[in-house]
Amino acid sequence: MRKKTAFIFGLGYVGLHLAHQLNLIGWDIVGTSRNPKKISPPGNCTWKILPFDVDSFTNEIEAHLLDSQIIISTIAPIKCNDPVLKQYRNILKQFSGWIGYISATSVYPSQPNRWVDETTVPKPATARGIARWKAEQEWDEVTGAEIFRVA
């Protein structure tokens, strides 16, 4: 039986929590970090942690992407460009598994004293929000990713 592998771009705060929860239900974890030596998987988890350089494609990451069943990206855009799509667009475009993109609520307009939910039309007012909104649209167009907006 083939192992279930989840590939997570960006093992930061959200990525680490996702990795831990997926690992608890039987998924093998491969993830990236700009500084892999700072990541310590909890308990006896044996995660594969790869270095991620926003300006470099690596064959090792490509090989693990091709061996994964799900891919999640938590990496924020840099200068209005998504670094994951910049390097791995062609692989992600052809990926047949499930893809998720973790975005942010900064894509919504300021709504003092009002609820914001998935029916609220995105209208970012900050540079970070605009970059996230652009990245969401690109992930959807290229991969059909499910978009999650976290606060």
What is the predicted role of each segment?
Residues 137-151:
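Conserved beta-loop-beta element that borders a ligand/cofactor-binding pocket
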Residues 11-12, 150:
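Glycine-rich Rossmann-fold phosphate-binding loop(s) that bind the pyrophosphate
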Residues 5-11:
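Conserved N-terminal Rossmann-fold NAD(P)-binding element of oxidoreductases
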Residues 47-91:
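NAD(P)H-binding glycine-rich loop region in Rossmannoid oxidoreductase-like domains
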Residues 22:
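Aromatic pocket-lining residues of Rossmann-like dinucleotide-binding sites
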Residues 15-16:
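N-terminal Rossmann-fold NAD(P) dinucleotide-binding loop
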Residues 89-127:
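Conserved Rossmann-fold NAD(P)-dependent oxidoreductase catalytic core, especially the SDR/UDP-sugar
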Residues 31-37, 53-54:
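N-terminal Rossmann-fold cofactor-binding loop
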